């Protein structure tokens, strides 16, 4: 279900403050966050944000095509290890 248009997109306050501070001084450093639910807004373009996937922080470079998506969409939490092996030798 989409968010109402009369509401602004959700961005965690601590993340927004860090991005605004970096935009003011023009710095380029990695921002570490656990806020996977935050929406990517145009002020984030050009920054590298390390998003937590449950185990580690994955650095993601924000581009203009990512605006409107959530941060968690770019840090997968599950790793596919393959389907179960068909072990015919043990059945004999």
Swiss-Prot record:
Species for this entry: Piper cenocladum (Ant piper)
Gene Ontology molecular functions: rRNA binding; structural constituent of ribosome
| Any one biological process term the GO annotation gives | translation
What protein is this chain from? Small ribosomal subunit protein uS19c
Family under the similarity heading = Belongs to the universal ribosomal protein uS19 family.
Main role? Protein S19 forms a complex with S13 that binds strongly to the 16S ribosomal RNA.
Question: What does the UniProt entry say about where the protein is found?
Answer: Plastid, Chloroplast
Xref: HAMAP family: Ribosomal_uS19 (MF_00531)
Its Gene Ontology cellular component terms are: chloroplast; mitochondrial small ribosomal subunit
Identify the stretch annotated as signal peptide in this record: none
């Amino acid at each position: 279900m989409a968010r109402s248009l009369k509401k602004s997109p959700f961005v965690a306050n601590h993340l927004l403050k860090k991005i605004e501070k970096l935009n003011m001084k023009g710095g380029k450093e990695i921002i570490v966050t656990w806020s996977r639910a935050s929406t990517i807004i145009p002020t984030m373009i050009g920054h590298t944000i390390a998003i937590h996937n449950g185990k580690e922080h994955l650095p993601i470079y924000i581009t203009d095509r990512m605006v409107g998506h959530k941060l968690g969409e770019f840090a997968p939490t599950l790793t596919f290890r393959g389907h179960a092996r068909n072990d015919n030798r043990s059945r004999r």
